[in-house]
């Protein structure tokens, strides 16, 4: 296939011309796919895309967890606009911790809604059922192996367990089936699970086998849709962590009690990470406690920074109504979550994310006819933000 990507574009063109009404779009979000996973694996298809398309290592959004980044990619907006600030959040109206899994929580239009407005049919495939609950708006169909209908089981076969690498292969087969049997679909969004990355380091043979297989599926996707643009990025990488703090217990034992500590990493996939992540939102009992609580937190081993809500909003573009009074940032080997004791040494096999140390990911743009300038793609969420727009936005031709 002759690559069509033009990487010398210096100004934004009409977004309708950029995407081209006839050119299909395939977005693949490889969950947990940091650059080290790419470089340590045999992935000839991605190697080809890197050489013949646009490739960059870009910044992902904080907290470096799936919901924040997936929603940002799917809306082309920052969390301050779409409202998703973690896999979980503290609902101040009900005073309870809740999972962010409902589409009503997403406050910005999805790329699927934008595409639908231009007459483009779209389909969402995700290994994780939480994604099809969070981001289905505008899709013709949203498919997850966790909730696969009998129709899809008849087509692809029984869905593997969510805690497996095989579940990603099932997902790719389902996407390929759709490409081969429904030529009217113009936008595909494919989101894998990072269970293999939580389980295996990038140098492990199991990880290399998994990613080589994923690469072979991407080759088949390009063969099935040779005229489509293919956009690939990730939400975060995954790294070993050696220490976890229960910040509620740690603060209580140091005479600076708090209302609650929320791990934005926490979701229903407990086996992935036990709910531990590299950031935490701290809700105070009283605003007058801020200084004392922050001092306690800064004294804990493995805490890089403790910042106020105002600083977190400005620095990470978060929605203030959905984060705590303080935000705690861990170092490269420390995570936060609920424990039976105030801290726990984690085993050598434990891997997670959520911190700044997992917020660099690869980005590939291949076969796009008129993309924006390469400088535009400074963050992962911008990979498709320029598509299906009604008006040319000044941000399309400038990096942030």
Predicted regions and their residues:
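Bacterial N-terminal signal peptides
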Residues: 1-6
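Catalytic metal-binding/acid-base residues of hydrolase active sites
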Residues: 33-34, 193, 200, 236-238
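Short, structured active-site-proximal loop/turn typified by the sulfatase FGly-forming signature C/S-X-P-X-R
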Residues: 36-81, 123
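Active-site neighborhoods of enzymes that stabilize oxyanions during catalysis
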Residues: 266-398
């Amino acid at each position: 296939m002759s690559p069509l990507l033009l990487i010398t574009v210096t100004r934004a063109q009409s977004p309708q011309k950029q995407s081209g009404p006839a050119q299909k779009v395939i977005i693949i979000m490889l969950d947990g796919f940091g650059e080290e996973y790419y470089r340590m694996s045999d992935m000839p298809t991605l190697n080809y895309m890197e050489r013949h398309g646009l490739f960059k290592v870009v910044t992902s959004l904080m907290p470096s967890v799936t919901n924040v980044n997936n929603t940002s990619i799917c809306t082309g907006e920052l969390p301050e606009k779409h409202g998703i600030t973690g896999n979980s959040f503290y609902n101040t109206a009900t005073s309870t911790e809740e999972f962010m899994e409902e589409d009503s929580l997403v406050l910005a239009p999805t790329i699927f809604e934008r595409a639908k407005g231009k007459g483009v049919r779209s389909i969402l495939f995700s290994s994780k059922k939480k994604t099809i609950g969070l981001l289905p708006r505008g899709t013709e169909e949203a498919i997850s192996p966790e909730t696969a209908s009998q129709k899809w089981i008849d087509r692809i076969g029984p869905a593997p367990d969510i805690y497996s690498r095989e579940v990603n292969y099932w997902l790719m087969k389902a996407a390929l089936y759709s490409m081969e049997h429904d030529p009217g679909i113009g936008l595909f969004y494919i989101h894998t699970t990072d269970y293999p990355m939580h389980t295996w380091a990038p140098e492990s043979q199991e990880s290399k086998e998994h990613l080589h297989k994923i690469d072979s599926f991407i080759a088949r996707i390009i063969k099935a849709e040779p005229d489509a643009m293919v956009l690939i990025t990730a939400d975060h990488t995954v790294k070993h962590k050696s220490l976890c703090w229960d910040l509620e217990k740690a603060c209580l034992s140091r005479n600076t009690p708090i209302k609650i500590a929320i791990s934005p990493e926490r979701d229903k996939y407990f086996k992935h990470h036990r709910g531990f992540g590299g950031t935490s939102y701290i809700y105070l009992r009283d605003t007058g406690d801020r200084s004392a609580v922050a001092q306690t937190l800064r004294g804990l081993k493995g805490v890089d920074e403790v910042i106020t809500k105002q600083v977190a909003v400005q620095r990470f573009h978060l929605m203030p109504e959905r984060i705590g009074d303080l935000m705690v940032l861990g170092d490269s080997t420390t995570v936060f979550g609920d424990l039976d004791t105030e801290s726990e040494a984690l085993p050598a096999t434990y891997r997670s994310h959520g911190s700044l140390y997992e917020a660099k990911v690869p980005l590939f743009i291949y076969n796009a006819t008129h993309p924006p300038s390469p400088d535009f793609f400074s963050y992962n969420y911008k990979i498709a933000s320029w598509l299906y727009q009604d008006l040319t936005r000044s941000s399309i031709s400038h990096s942030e």
